[in-house]
Curated annotation (Swiss-Prot):
Glycans are attached at N157, N164, N383, N395. The chain crosses the membrane at residues 5-25, 210-230, 234-254, 293-313, 342-362, 433-455, 483-503, 542-562, 578-598, 617-637. This is Choline transporter-like protein 5-B. It catalyses: choline(out) + n H(+)(in) = choline(in) + n H(+)(out). Keywords: Antiport, Cell membrane, Glycoprotein, Membrane, Transmembrane, Transmembrane helix, Transport. InterPro entries: Choline_transptr-like (IPR007603). It comes from the Eukaryota. Residues 677-692 have a biased composition (Basic residues). Residues 1-4, 231-233, 314-341, 456-482, 563-577, 638-687 are cytoplasmic. PANTHER family: CHOLINE TRANSPORTER-LIKE (SLC FAMILY 44), CHOLINE TRANSPORTER-LIKE PROTEIN 5. GO terms for cellular component: membrane; plasma membrane.
Amino acid sequence: GCTDVLCCVIFVIVILGYIVLGTVAWMHGDPRKVVYPTDSYGQFCGQQETPNANKAILFYFNILQCANPSVLINLQCPTTQLCVSKCPDRFATYIDMQYSYRRNKGSWEYYKQFCKPGFNNPDKPISQVLRDEDCPSMIVPSRPFLQRCFPDFITRNGTLTVANQTSFKDGHGKIRSVVDLRDAANGITSLLDAKEVGTKIFEDYASSWFWILIGLVISMLVSLVFILLLRFTAGVLFWLVIFGVIAAVGYGIWHCYWEYSSLKGKPDSDVTISDIGFQTDFRVYLQLSQTWLIFMTSLAVIEAIIILVLIFLRNRVRIAIALLKEGSKAIGCIMSTLFYPIITFLLLALCIAYWAVTAVFLASSGEAVYKVMSTLPDCKYTNLTCDPETFSQSNVTKLCPGSQCTFAFYGGESLYHRYIFVLQLCNLLVFLWLVNFTIALGQCTLAGAFAAYYWALRKPADIPPCPLASSFGRALRYHTGSLAFGALILSIVQFIRIILEYLDHKLKGAHNAFTRFLLCCLKCCFWCLEHFIKFMNRNAYIMISIYGKNFCTSARDAFFLLMRNVMRVAVLDKVTDFLLFLGKLLISGSVGVLAFFFFTRQIPVIQEEVPSLNYYWVPLLTVIFGSYMIAHGFFNVYAMCVDTLFLCFLLDLEKNDGSATRPYYMCSSLRAILNKKNQKRPKETKRGRKQKKEQPKSRH
């Protein structure tokens, strides 16, 4: 019958509510608020069919104000912001413009591009212009970055310059250093260099996505070939994997030593990494001998660990290989299980896409909210809401001279707008629940198919038809509530971990040692709890697929079964995981080496096809990580197969004794590994033997 019906009902209601949440967010949200920058009046820059259609860049009247601490609080710069068609390309001040305007009318035509729309009075006194904020007091050579005008910084011989100048006029009669501009730019961009790296990385993805996709397809084909070979030659192939990894790591040690030796004696190669600090060009680190020494030492430690594990666990490795051979036979009988990860991937992609779209629409919900921005530390109106239409006539401008009524964010006073943050948290929690349910559904489906293989007395004759489809149908029809229950427990723990990570990020600058220590302990505890729940859920789903009981009963039975066989679990299961991990490393490593030679233009045949990149390691790391995840998806089928067969084997040992009435269901190879035998039936008469021969026919 159905298990955990109450949780199933709650799960269905939550899904319906999630659909309603997405619909409401879609009705209220506007992704343009995320895509386009917004000026001080809440208008989009660059939006078609608006006055700003040809003005796609945001310009700051006084970017020096962006170094104010209020930027960190309000995420807005306390100065007027306008949409412009292009950034200024020269130094100029309003005072100099007025002086030259008497001789050259063209100076005003250029300067007024950066004034408020409709303002056309270059003779207006500078004091009144700055009071009414009709025009900026100065402009500096800038370039667009993230659709915003930022000073065009260039470092020449270690000196920071803007348009080959190290100083400028600030429009108030003072000479300022361009370092002040950099500090202001950093205040609003939150580490401009990091964002520049992000832009270059995005450009690299845009130019190399096709080749990244080819690399991932190659890794998928290699993974499939690896699994097919494993079906027939598990022992030989895995020993080749082991020695292949040892050889690859050994080559890495030799290559690092060769690079380390070749850098000896070269100028500046003995500089330490701490001396040069963080560099956006990672090729700088490859010119340091210390970098290659660290690589060589790390690889040597990895090599030693692998060799020691093989020496002390060689007998257990043989047992694990035999268990994998049995798993290979099971997958050979149910080949459709190899392609089930595709279903899981599509379901996960659907969950991720729905969550991301809902999050964007929630973030872009609401009307424009304006707040008072002031550079005066004692202004009591700072950060309060205001109306830009009536702000100039209010008392705020008198009590806080120079204050601005600036667009802050999109929000509102309705019940929906007040609880957008709570809705975002709900969006995240339900997303985690759906993702974990999808993974649980896959695990239970595979476990049911492999359990059907194990409990077939005559393999493959007694295996039911379409075991994977049957297991999938049973899991959805009878055990949706149990799978949702286990997924919910795991999702809550993951949700708490995300909150702890957020708090840790916010408290990085705190000096309270006890708070940091407590937070670190909580993160460690919940990390351990998450991994324990994942392990128990996996085995609980196997028990559900075998006995069809509810989640709590299955989890309890699985836990005590594993505790009664803790040594077998600790050795056999983990050695199997280790061997599969080596296979993932070999696949991702070999595809990664191929990608390295391709993106560094070391393959002459296709050298001209390589796109021009800012950082070749961007597509390289993407291919390596993607290859590892693809191999991980395919090998998860094997891991689930081995775990299911192993759990079934433990149950077989406890429920049966090898007698004629209770024979072992395990195959002969597993019985040989553990020295177990089925008792022979006593000698029978010819008639009895004849009846015995006819017995299988009677079962059908």
